[in-house]
Structure formats: C-alpha cells, structure tokens
C-alpha cells in the first residue's frame, strides 16, 4: 500500500447515491490510489456499511471514511479523514463535531489511521458550503487558510473543495506555492481528462466525485490522465 503522500488520484463515492456493481468494480480496478466514502446529504451508517462491504468483497484498494457526522463512524476503513472547515462561520464545523467524534470513538480507531484536513469550500451554491455555514473567501483568505493549516495547525492536508463546480487553476497554483509540507488536495467539477491534468499540475492529489455518477467513462479516464497508467 502506498504512503498517503504518494497518492495522486482519489475517487470519492457518496453512500447516499446509487452505483451499480459494474461501475463500482470499474472504479475499484481503475488504478486510483484510494476511494473516499463521504457526502453531505442523507448519509447513514447503513449506507456507509453497505458501500464498504461492496468494495471489500473483492477489491484491495485503500478505503477512507470522511468523518462528517459521528453517527457514521465505523471500524473497517483503512483511514479516517476528519475535515476542519476553516471558512465556516460556526466553530462546530471546525472543532466541535470533530472533538465529539474523537472523544466517543478514540478507542475504536488507531490514531495513526486518522488524518485531519484543513477544508476550504469555495462554491457558494454547494450544499456543503451552505450546510456548514461558510463565508466566501477571496484569494488572500484562502492563502491565509493554507498557511494556518500548515504552520499553525500542522495539518497533513489542505483541501480546496469546489464541490461540483470546476475551480480556478490560478488560485490552486498560488495556494500550492504557499505550502511546503502540507499536501494539497483539490476536488470539484473534474469531468474530463483535460481538467484532471490541469488541476494536477498544481494540486498534489485530485479527487473525482460527481462525474462517477454522470459520466463513468470520462471519470475512469482521469486516473490515467494524472498517473499515466
């Protein structure tokens, strides 16, 4: 299994969305470095467990649970990513939910498997932006959040999340220039190989999600586009 800092491509699956066994097998065998299980709406423990069991049935790809609600925490994942939404106006989305989850489930998870992410959501129309009550940052704000993620909180990841919309490559480039050790993740609106390549020029890791459900063939091509498999 690769170290996380060697991951270049991740698929993100929403346990509240339908995916056929055929498409799930294609995702798992695509050569992606990992699969994140996570979403915003209607995410339940049953949905998380069902998706995990379907992946584990015949695949060895690393699987990550993105912890947004403590009710969906369950053993069996290789890693747990805990988002801290830095541009939320509510402390609970940066600290309180995370604290509650760790307090309740710390004995269940090996701490080496738990990684905190500095999250910055940049799409005002996204459900995640509205759900976490975010404020829309400008470029200088985002660069400052990146600085905080690395220099203040010493987080392993800074995640630029456009959540369904394709983002600004120039912003991603400038944020990357602020980071030396923290790994830059980009997610949002990647639907083509050209977009995957463009964002991968600047981000350490790209995350492909929505296009799995809208155009599976193009989504699968993004793996080779950034990894050259």
Curated annotation (Swiss-Prot):
Domain of life of the organism encoding this protein: Bacteria
Print the keywords alphabetically. Answer: Lipid biosynthesis, Lipid metabolism, Magnesium, Metal-binding, Phospholipid biosynthesis, Phospholipid metabolism, Transferase
Checking Pfam families in the record gives: PcrB
Q: What is the role of this chain?
A: Prenyltransferase that catalyzes in vivo the transfer of the heptaprenyl moiety of heptaprenyl pyrophosphate (HepPP; 35 carbon atoms) to the C3 hydroxyl of sn-glycerol-1-phosphate (G1P), producing heptaprenylglyceryl phosphate (HepGP). This reaction is an ether-bond-formation step in the biosynthesis of archaea-type G1P-based membrane lipids found in Bacillales.
User: Which GO molecular-function terms appear in the entry?
Assistant: heptaprenylglyceryl phosphate synthase activity; magnesium ion binding
User: What's the cofactor?
Assistant: Mg(2+)
Write down the InterPro entries for this protein, in alphabetical order.
GGGP/HepGP_synthase_I (IPR039074), GGGP/HepGP_synthase_sf (IPR038597), GGGP_HepGP_synthase (IPR008205)
| Subunit architecture | Homodimer.
The residues the record assigns to binding Mg(2+) are: 14, 40
Name the residues that bind sn-glycerol 1-phosphate.
12, 159-164, 189, 209-210
Regarding protein family, the annotation reads: Belongs to the GGGP/HepGP synthase family. Group I subfamily.
Organism, scientific name: Oceanobacillus iheyensis (strain DSM 14371 / CIP 107618 / JCM 11309 / KCTC 3954 / HTE831)
* GO BP term, pick one: glycerophospholipid biosynthetic process
Upper taxonomic lineage: Bacteria, Bacillati, Bacillota, Bacilli, Bacillales
Q: Which reaction does it catalyse?
A: sn-glycerol 1-phosphate + all-trans-heptaprenyl diphosphate = 3-heptaprenyl-sn-glycero-1-phosphate + diphosphate
- Under which pathway is this protein filed? Membrane lipid metabolism; glycerophospholipid metabolism
Stated EC number for the protein is 2.5.1.n9
Name assigned to this protein: Heptaprenylglyceryl phosphate synthase
